[in-house]
Amino acid sequence: MEGNIQLALICVGAALSIGLAGLGAGIGIGSVGQGACMGLARNPEVQPKLMVFMILGMALAESIAIYGLVISLILLYANPLLG
């Protein structure tokens, strides 16, 4: 019985890990996109330079979701807590 509760809590932790990481990444990417659109509307001449920084910012924000996915996969498949 105790193993089932521990496994259920691990699954909840994995779900929270990927869910919250995805939420944070979505907010970050939205913020980067909003800033890029506002900057492009103010000064259209800087579009090539702005695109580079926008893509870099979105990639860094997306890395948060990838870290959450890695943590979830470790919890589900290579869990050191189950022994």
UniProtKB/Swiss-Prot annotation:
The record marks E62 as: Reversibly protonated during proton transport. It is a multi-pass membrane protein. GO terms for molecular function: lipid binding; proton-transporting ATP synthase activity, rotational mechanism. It is found in: Cell inner membrane. Keywords: ATP synthesis, Cell inner membrane, Cell membrane, CF(0), Hydrogen ion transport, Ion transport, Lipid-binding, Membrane, Transmembrane, Transmembrane helix, Transport. Coiled coil: none annotated. GO terms for cellular component: plasma membrane; proton-transporting ATP synthase complex; proton-transporting two-sector ATPase complex, proton-transporting domain. The chain crosses the membrane at residues 9-29, 51-71. InterPro entries: ATP_synth_csu_bac/chlpt, ATP_synth_F0_csu, ATP_synth_F0_csu_DDCD_BS, ATP_synth_F0_csu_sf, ATPase_proteolipid_c-like_dom, F/V-ATP_Csub_sf. F(1)F(0) ATP synthase produces ATP from ADP in the presence of a proton or sodium gradient. F-type ATPases consist of two structural domains, F(1) containing the extramembraneous catalytic core and F(0) containing the membrane proton channel, linked together by a central stalk and a peripheral stalk. During catalysis, ATP synthesis in the catalytic domain of F(1) is coupled via a rotary mechanism of the central stalk subunits to proton translocation. Key component of the F(0) channel; it plays a direct role in translocation across the membrane. A homomeric c-ring of between 10-14 subunits forms the central stalk rotor element with the F(1) delta and epsilon subunits. Belongs to the ATPase C chain family. F-type ATPases have 2 components, F(1) - the catalytic core - and F(0) - the membrane proton channel. F(1) has five subunits: alpha(3), beta(3), gamma(1), delta(1), epsilon(1). F(0) has three main subunits: a(1), b(2) and c(10-14). The alpha and beta chains form an alternating ring which encloses part of the gamma chain. F(1) is attached to F(0) by a central stalk formed by the gamma and epsilon chains, while a peripheral stalk is formed by the delta and b chains. This is ATP synthase subunit c. It comes from Desulfotalea psychrophila (strain LSv54 / DSM 12343).
